[in-house]
């Protein structure tokens, strides 16, 4: 009774953010540059529709745990009317895994609720709800858990259910039923019926072992390019602060057009999929996301391509 399935992580988080009940005029909603675009849009909508203040801040680089904690502490201290904080469990921009439990505790100590975006974390990082301390979590099931597209879910702590309003006045389910917080239209029930099998597969594979392997893949390519002159790796090698996802910036790469050009080059010339990601305060990056099936030989191709193209914008 604390979890309901949704049509994906985005729908789940829209349901939590847009229907967050305690926000009043004059309160503040906070999010950071590493947060997912659509969840930022949802916070914008929530603040505008309630007459609340919207506070966006940029996380400092290098994004060490100490720097991240200091940044969240400062923004919470500087925003005395803060009521809601959006926190991303694993950033889809650069792969940052912040110290979630510490930030949630910091926010709660100031009376600030946290909506945790775990879309990239479920099936990727081993964790439990208790590990986060969060009362509200939205997540995807098609990314790292490998369930079909159209699967995700929300978690709402039992004693906080009334703080998320039913979806557009939904009365298909009772107000004390978490399912009232999710749209009730026709869904792909076949996709949802596969979720138990996807979970069973991940359990059989051993999530802890998967995570260790993904970290090895990430470290493999990063270690081989970190000292390339002018190349920026967007996260430090601090244990617990990243997963498989990481990002880099070629020397001289500045605007979004540069990032798109580089991503196209890597795909067309080297058959390597890197993703141009904008949104970070420091500028666009190229995201690399190895999966369990990737080999060291494939990562060697990535390393060679990065070294060969280091002068693309220099």
Regions found by a protein language model. Name each.
Residues 53-55, 64-119, 123:
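Active-site phosphate-binding strand-loop segment of PLP-dependent enzymes
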Residues 255-258, 264-274, 278-314:
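PLP-dependent enzyme catalytic core of the Aspartate aminotransferase-like
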Residues 215-219, 225-269:
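Conserved PLP-binding catalytic core of the aspartate aminotransferase-like
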Residues 132-172:
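Active-site PLP attachment segment
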Residues 2, 6-7, 20-40, 53, ...:
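Conserved PLP-anchoring active-site segment centered on the Schiff-base-forming lysine
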Residues 176-189:
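A short glycine-threonine-serine/GTX helix/turn-capping micro-motif
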Residues 190, 195-236:
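Conserved PLP-dependent catalytic core of the aminotransferase class-I/II
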């Amino acid at each position: 009774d604390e979890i309901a399935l949704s049509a994906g992580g985005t729908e789940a988080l829209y349901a939590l953010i847009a229907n967050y009940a305690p926000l009043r005029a004059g309160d503040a909603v906070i999010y950071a540059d590493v947060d997912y675009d659509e969840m930022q849009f949802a916070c914008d909508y929530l603040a505008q529709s309630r007459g609340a203040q919207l506070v966006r801040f940029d996380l400092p680089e290098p994004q060490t745990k100490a720097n991240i904690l200091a940044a969240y502490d400062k923004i919470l201290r500087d925003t005395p009317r803060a009521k809601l904080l959006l926190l991303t469990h694993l950033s889809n921009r650069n792969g940052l895994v912040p110290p979630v439990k510490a930030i949630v505790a910091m926010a709660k100590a100031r009376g600030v609720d946290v909506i945790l975006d775990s879309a990239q974390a479920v099936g990727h990082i081993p964790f439990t709800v208790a590990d986060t301390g969060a009362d509200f979590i939205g997540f995807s099931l098609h990314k790292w858990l490998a369930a079909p597209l159209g699967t995700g879910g929300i978690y709402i702590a039992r004693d906080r259910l009334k703080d998320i309003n039913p979806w557009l006045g939904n009365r298909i389910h009772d107000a004390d039923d978490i399912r009232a917080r999710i749209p009730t239209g026709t869904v792909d029930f076949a996709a949802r019926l596969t979720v138990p099998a996807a979970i069973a597969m991940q359990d059989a594979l051993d999530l802890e072992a998967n995570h260790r392997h993904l970290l090895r893949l990430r470290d493999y390519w990063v270690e081989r390019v970190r000292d390339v002159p002018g190349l920026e790796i967007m996260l430090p090698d601090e244990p617990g602060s990243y997963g498989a996802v990481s990002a880099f910036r070629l020397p001289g790469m500045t605007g979004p057009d540069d990032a798109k050009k580089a991503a196209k080059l890597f795909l067309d010339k080297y058959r390597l999929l890197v993703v141009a990601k904008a949104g970070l305060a420091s500028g666009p990056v190229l995201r690399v996301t190895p999966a369990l099936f990737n080999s060291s030989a494939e990562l060697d191709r990535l390393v060679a391509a990065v070294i060969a193209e280091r002068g693309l914008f220099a």
